[in-house]
């Protein structure tokens, strides 16, 4: 809503490929669009509507902290699903109904395997730091998860680099994406 003027593509539901480093303001760029497009909907238990995949627990926490005030203001429930924390508590958050899930791939896959989460209602998927997920060996889980979300849904992928693995993701899962390059040092965004 606040940054709607800067987010025409993501708000319009276009697939987005963002090239940018951490801390270039992209969390709000994808997060506000996801929240704005999900606002007014209610998730059934275990069936989130929006998914943000990140490589690390630390990044999951940063994204959650950044988006929580905005999510509250539009009455959306966020669940954070990461390794190294109580899986029981995360399962109960999903059972209670969370519109948006911020997750690391391994733990999300564990919860799906346990029957605690389904992705077939997810219509907006964000991959943040996709190159880091590839470097950490998460590609098999990431593709398995992307294969479960709604095929006609919106996808936004952010990556500092576009190596072979990330390029494969872009080609396989993004449809006619609009490409943004973010240079945090200049604070400039170029659209191609």
State the predicted function of each range.
Residues 17, 35, 39, 60, ...:
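Nucleotide phosphate-binding site architecture
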């Amino acid at each position: 809503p606040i940054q709607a003027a800067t987010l025409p593509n993501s708000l319009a539901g276009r697939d987005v490929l963002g090239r940018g480093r951490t801390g270039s303001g992209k969390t709000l760029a994808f997060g506000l669009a996801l929240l704005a497009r999900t606002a007014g909907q209610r998730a059934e238990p275990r069936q989130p509507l929006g998914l943000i995949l990140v490589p690390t627990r630390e990044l999951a926490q940063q994204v959650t902290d950044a988006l929580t005030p905005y999510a509250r203001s539009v009455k959306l429930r966020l669940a954070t699903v990461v390794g190294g924390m109580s899986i029981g508590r995360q399962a109960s958050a999903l059972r209670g109904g969370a519109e948006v899930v911020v997750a690391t791939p391994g733990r999300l896959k564990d919860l799906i395997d346990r029957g605690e989460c389904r992705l077939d209602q997810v219509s907006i998927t964000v991959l943040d730091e996709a190159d880091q997920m590839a470097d950490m060996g998460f590609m098999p889980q990431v593709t398995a998860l992307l294969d479960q979300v709604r095929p006609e849904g919106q996808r936004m992928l952010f990556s500092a680099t576009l190596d072979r693995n990330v390029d494969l993701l872009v080609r396989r899962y993004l449809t006619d994406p609009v490409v943004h390059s973010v240079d945090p040092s200049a604070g400039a965004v170029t659209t191609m």
